[in-house]
Amino acid sequence: MKRSALLASFLPLALGCDSAETHSCASAFSVSSAAAASFCATFTASTVTATTGVPDVFLSNCDYKTKHLSSACSCLGTADGSAPASTPAAPAVSSSSKVGKAPAVAATRTSAIPTTFHTTAVRVPLSTSAAAAVTSQAVLPAQSSVAGNGGTTCTVTEYASISSAVASCSNILLSNINAPASSTIDLTGLQTGAAVIFAGETTFGDTYDSDFDPIVISGTDVTITGEEGHVINGNGEAYWDGEGSNGGQDKPDHFIVVKDMYNSKIENLNILNWPVHCFEIENTEYLTISGLILNNTAGDAANSKSDGDPAAHNTDGFDIKQSDFLTLSNSWVHNQDDCVAVTSGSSIVVDNLYCYGGHGLSIGSIGGKSNNTVDGVTFSNSQVINSENGCRIKSNADTTGEVYNVKYENITLSGISDYGIDIQQDYENGGATGDPTNGVKIENISFVNVKGTMSDGKDYYILCGDGSCSNFVFTDVDITGGSDDSCNYPSSGCP
């Protein structure tokens, strides 16, 4: 038995098996492993010299040569009965880094083949200051295997083929898509129960338009996910000028718009260098988001247009509004603005996030929008590192709204520069005035086991309007390193 296992482990080397990462034939067999196993059982049972009856996905990617098909079958199912696996690569951190190519076909279909992709925990390099702060805690989320939902599977490698695949396929593999300028990857017409898998590197032509949305997604019972080694590259460096959505050249304001999405999942995506806000999530119910890596590290550096400031600005990770029963978990964000910002919605859980370099975990700003009610939001088991704020609730002056039942629990802060806990009701035109108003009611707010350190600023800052704040509870809260704390509510003062 041991001898058989040992031989099996050396079989790929002995056969000279190609890597699925670099060879389209091996990749096609790896991606469609179930179909490959069925085909190879027949193909290797007898001597076959013709290419008739071979599934198109294998034929086209194996150069229409029976010897390539035979070799791929021989290499299928080695040590563990699955296709030979290659070492997973970390997400690319620059636009010049290409990642695992998927099958080089334009729009290949196979019927009723659930496709499974495997991903594992990976790391990307942090800046020196981040590594010094919490190197051991900067592990990226493990990304679990995913599967399609049956039905027709389409592999798309050309932007022009996306719309037809969305209309006719229940499983869609978007492989190394290059979306031309002013061309949205439109996933709003997905079939109920559809699955979309991003593979390779997804790129976009430069579009200097604040109303342009590079990716738009909607649907019911939909799964959006990513294959091992993929990256969705927003090409933010082409737009960054230190001003974000506050001025400068026009740039896409929202990179990925998720709207009208019900009972669906977004998981295991690697997103790099988005221009301004990354996710705009609106009008969803029972949406689950998990295992995402949002890496805007490159935006920390100044460029020729940013006048010495970080080039990226207003790069919120997740902006959530008018959404109910949403769960966001197990994700990693390095950006230059809010890690998460909830401006309206109910029954929202944000759990196990790692937030670096931005403005923390936020409610708001509330007021002056079409919907100004937040009810039932929990931030839990998360870290906010080297950011301006830790936990923040803010409302706009001279507006109305409600913020009810918000809990921050088991939150660790480190290297916070402005406010550890911050509740303000004095925002006007995007800035604080120091004069709070009471049109937005903030009630039933709790902080439980929120601890950490400041690099500067105030540990606690609470500025409520007259009578507009009530029932704040602080349990096991301990933030140190700041100075000049100021709290006008509760009457007992700061924690």
UniProtKB/Swiss-Prot annotation:
It catalyses: (1,4-alpha-D-galacturonosyl)n+m + H2O = (1,4-alpha-D-galacturonosyl)n + (1,4-alpha-D-galacturonosyl)m. It is found in: Secreted. Keywords: Cell wall biogenesis/degradation, Disulfide bond, Glycoprotein, Glycosidase, Hydrolase, Repeat, Secreted, Signal. GO terms for biological process: cell wall organization; pectin catabolic process. It is an enzyme of class 3 (hydrolase). PbH1 repeats lie at residues 261-283, 284-322, 323-344, 374-395, 403-425, 469-492. Residues 1-16 form the signal peptide. GO terms for cellular component: extracellular region. Its EC number is 3.2.1.15. Glycans are attached at N295, N371, N410, N444. GO terms for molecular function: polygalacturonase activity. Its main location: secreted. The active site is at D337 (proton donor), H359. Disulfide bonds join C154-C169, C339-C355, C464-C469, C487-C494. SMART domains: PbH1. Pfam families: Glyco_hydro_28 (PF00295). Involved in maceration and soft-rotting of plant tissue. Hydrolyzes the 1,4-alpha glycosidic bonds of de-esterified pectate in the smooth region of the plant cell wall. Belongs to the glycosyl hydrolase 28 family. This is Probable endopolygalacturonase D. It comes from Aspergillus niger (strain ATCC MYA-4892 / CBS 513.88 / FGSC A1513).
